[in-house]
Amino acid sequence: MDSRYNSTAGIGDLNQLSAAIPATRVEVSVSCRNLLDRDTFSKSDPICVLYVQGVGNKEWREFGRTEVIDNTLNPDFVRKFILDYFFEERENLRFDLYDVDSKSPNLSKHDFLGQVFCTLGEIVGSQGSRLEKPIVGIPGKKCGTIILTAEELNCCRDAVLMQFCANKLDKKDFFGKSDPFLVFYRSNEDGSFTICHKTEVVKNTLNPVWQAFKISVRALCNGDYDRTIKVEVYDWDRDGSHDFIGEFTTSYRELSRGQSQFNVYEVVNPKKKGKKKKYTNSGTVTLLSFLVETEVSFLDYIKGGTQINFTVAIDFTASNGNPAQPTSLHYMNPYQLNAYGMALKAVGEIVQDYDSDKMFPALGFGAKLPPDGRISHEFALNGNPQNPYCDGIEGVMEAYYRSLKSVQLYGPTNFAPVINHVARYASSVKDGSQYFVLLIVTDGVISDMAQTKESIVNASKLPMSIIIVGVGPAEFDAMVELDGDDVRVSSRGKYAERDIVQFVPFRDYIDRSGNHILSMARLAKDVLAEIPEQFLSYMRARGIKPSPAPPPYTPPTHVLQTQI
């Protein structure tokens, strides 16, 4: 089958575009201080090797090596590591350091100087995107310090405003001229193509002028200026069977020349070219304008010091079942996390990298509290309403397990109190220095729908997002309504200013093979993927610019280098 027809199968539906856009890319620089000295007559000759961990199999694979720097315990490596960055993924990294003793590329032939484990989010989320960590791995020895800095690559935050027109396109309609539109594809590493933009249809003309459109350089070519961009020209048909007119290829570098004779493209239909000797083309497409704009990115705010505050709220209603019974969604299995624990850990372990103090408020709702059995929809899991903060995700898990032993599951399922709890904090910080993420884990049918909608509409004006994970077998129709992807949430005639709710049913992520690590990585990816855009939509709407990052660390330079 002609590969062209495969690639156009989805041209009618471009709603999933955002999922296909690659992450931004960051450049990680490595410096070390006070490395171990393994050489007898001189100082060590260090090299740093980066390993990345696979999500499913947890295997470490070598990603790259710096150069060797001769005779120093304080190297500032020149060669950088360029990594794809996804906010919604936990990207585990390992930096191994060696003292190079020969030209051999085999690392076992060199002296091990120690290693550091971290996540890419940890580096990016540190103040000024600069992380210092002790080097470990040699018992009883002080191995020195590693300094890791992350810098977003400039090409990843550029967007392009482009406009095209066409001349003398083939006539495809029996009773009139064509109704042309353009479809843009970026090429992938494996030679396949991914759709990245579709223009509007211009009706009944062979010489259309399309409206200017804006697209990020990441979406257009993944930041690679020489990567092929394929453009297909179609004649629109009401029944969706659009007629192929022809195609051409270009690249970002060619387009960046702007309007010129280099940017007039012949539209060619390969089938016609193969059959007809006199065939030249099916018309031409001309670039009318090309303007590059640099956009402020999520990482600009993080680097400037914006903190993400994470709060969890857990459903303690009786519909979860008696926690002492294995059938309960709150059952404490000594060998395996329950669904609540898995959801907390999956999302929390990623978000915690962006919160400097790692102290998280943890709330519960729908339970009777000791000693008097009053019903609460906003209680502290640690039992301290004045200070509901828990130390790290592990602290949240401990408080959750402790409270299961002391409270009585009851009802009803009310969300509004915990949403309003976080909104009170968010409403006091509107300068862009903090953003709040509330994770609600629930088993069910919501009881206070009207109040919850009102809370969401009010919260949509504040620096906050809400993630809802539904556990158990219930129907979650009401949650889908709160998600607001299809219809914006409204209350009393007022619509939410922006979409701030993301809902996912936990059952969609239960891995039949029992690989919980992989299924939880997928859960975290899906619930967190929208956060950076929700964050930016708040900052843009309020006209808040990122704070300047602290001045970059500039260590003293060393000149001697050897390649390995």
UniProtKB/Swiss-Prot annotation:
Its cofactor is Ca(2+). Residues 1-133, 142-265 form the C2 domain. The modification Phosphoserine is found at residue 260. Keywords: Calcium, Metal-binding, Phosphoprotein, Repeat. One of its GO terms (cellular component) is plasma membrane. GO terms for biological process: cellular response to calcium ion. Binds 3 Ca(2+) ions per C2 domain. Ca(2+) 1 binds at residues 39, 45, 99, 101. Pfam families: C2 (PF00168), Copine (PF07002). Ca(2+) 2 binds at residues 39, 99, 101, 111. Residues 309-510 form the VWFA domain. It comes from the Eukaryota. This is Copine-8. It comes from Homo sapiens. The gene is CPNE8.
